[in-house]
Amino acid sequence: QLNMLDTLDVFTRKHSENVASLTCRICEYLHCTKGFTEYCTICAYLHDIGKLYIPPQILQKPGRLTDEEFEIMKTHTTIGYDICMKDLKLRPYAAGPLYHHEALNGTGYPQGLTKKDIPYEAQIITVADEYDAIVSKRQYKTHIGISDTLKLIIENAQPGKGLDKSSALSEISSIAKLGKVNPIIVKCLFKVVLDDIYYEITCTQSYLDDIQDDLNLSLIHISEP
């Protein structure tokens, strides 16, 4: 059943692999059980399976999507859910495709759920998905450096931050805005990047100090989430 992902375009397939790998590492840092970690990882791998039925001209469009195109793109969540629910072996993992674009503050889709109603596995997958979508060189995004990505994700996961930081941030459609992601999970993401050198990025102590000074954060050196 998982072989159907091989028919996705090469970028979406690689993105699914990245999100699954990062989700697994986040679960490990959260000290999740082995069973829950395996479950989350498969949910993450399947999270974009609904894109099998999104027209290529929309999925691979190099420019920004129109409102109409974005509405079509959003259907990949419910399409993915339906694919999983129709297969007995995939049915347990249907939460990954359905909920990975929900936001803690209720601004997500397809159901506009808030934190108390969003499954925890989906909250983890959302953070991994946000990170990989920003770091990866997408057809419809300009490549953003790892340093800026980490700063933006963590900065916008802190309480009291505005939704619109600047005109520059408005270009980053996937950035984690106020209330959108779970900051506890973001902390684990940050440690994953530093400790596991995700995307083969090395970080010096001076780099860490710069981020901490810029964002006035103390979470960087926390050993437990």
Where are the language model's segments positioned?
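Histidine- and acidic-residue-rich, metal-dependent catalytic cores
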Residues: 1-219, 223
